[in-house]
């Protein structure tokens, strides 16, 4: 199974500049996708998940356009060919 992870520029720098990263997760959940992403890009994984392995509060993750916070979190099913978009919150004033 192959999943495409879409990253904004601020996170793409941690993936060698790639805004589109393809991963082959060991399973079929978002957690498996993030494990595979972290395996390829450890620094990126630490920006997305906290020390307990949960998605950080200021990071929004979407599977095929659906916010995972409302669809099972890390247990959200991910299909072959899915797009996972990772968007960190931006604050300023």
Where are these regions (language model features)?
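Ubiquitin-like/PB1-type beta-grasp interaction modules and other compact soluble beta-rich domains
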Residues: 1-92
């Amino acid at each position: 199974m192959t999943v495409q992870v879409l990253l904004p520029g601020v996170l793409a720098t941690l993936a060698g500049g790639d805004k589109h990263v393809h991963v082959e997760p060991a399973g079929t959940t978002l957690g498996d996708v993030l494990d595979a992403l972290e395996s390829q890009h450890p620094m990126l994984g630490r920006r997305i998940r906290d020390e307990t392995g949960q998605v950080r509060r200021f990071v929004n993750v979407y599977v095929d356009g659906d916010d995972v916070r409302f669809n099972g979190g890390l247990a959200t099913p991910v299909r072959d060919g899915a797009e996972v978009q990772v968007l960190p919150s931006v604050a300023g004033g």
